[in-house]
Amino acid sequence: MKKPIIGITLDEEKSKTYSKYPWYAARKNYSESIDLAGGTSIFLPHSSENINQYLNLIDGLVITGGDFDINPEIYGKEISSKFVKLKKERTFFEFEITKKAVDMNLPLLGICGGQQLLNVVLGGTLIQHIPDKIQSNINHEQENPRDQPSHVVKIKKSSNLYKITKSEEMFVNSAHHQSVDNLGKGLKVNSFTEDGVIEGIENPNQKFCIGVQWHPEFLIDDKDLEIFKALVESSRKN
């Protein structure tokens, strides 16, 4: 049986830790999670002119996270936090491919910053720095390693995420200082933390359109793999 091909977006760096020239990067556990879920993956360079070819090639899409933020101007706001860091080229590419993927009803999973991007693509806004808006005992930028849990998320029983995980709670990691604020068109909250931060979103009218604020590719909770399995299975039917 042919395995579904899942496209995974890359991060880009200009630091000289690897090369003195700009380079792409992605953690292995993104593709390893797709492999474990029964799919195969390819990484997508930030070539906007090739977006249509990418979308004709792949059966599903993962928008990954990274140590950067979406320019608030894209969702009609000014920068209000000194902690906002931008990557213009990556954001432009991911915005365009996500918009087209949604229009095509292509199965899509947004992870961390990928969830935030999905929300912005659909007209939503973001909290630019959580501590500026929400007082909380939860450290959403955990100090312990990312392969360890940080906190619990509550999952709504009415959501597709609940149908996938069959659970009302998950232990997750946490590596973000921004979060979804106003929801984009067609999106619903599927999970949240006790302090009210939105941890997951979805469009129930799409074949598979889910965003999570944590990094399920670390497979901390056994239900993380179920998310990737659901993406791959939806992509198999694409």
Predicted regions and their residues:
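Active-site-proximal beta-strand elements of phosphoester/diester hydrolases
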Residues: 210-213
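Conserved G/P- and acidic residue-centered "switch" motifs that form tight phosphate/ATP-binding loops
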Residues: 112
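N-terminal beta1-alpha1 cap of cysteine-dependent amidohydrolase-like domains
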Residues: 1-109, 120, 132-164, 171, ...
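Post-Walker A helix-loop "phosphate-sensing" segment adjacent to the P-loop in P-loop NTPases
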Residues: 123-127
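Hydrophobic, aromatic-enriched interface-forming segments
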Residues: 115-118
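A glycine-rich beta-turn/hairpin centered on an aromatic-Pro dipeptide
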Residues: 173-177
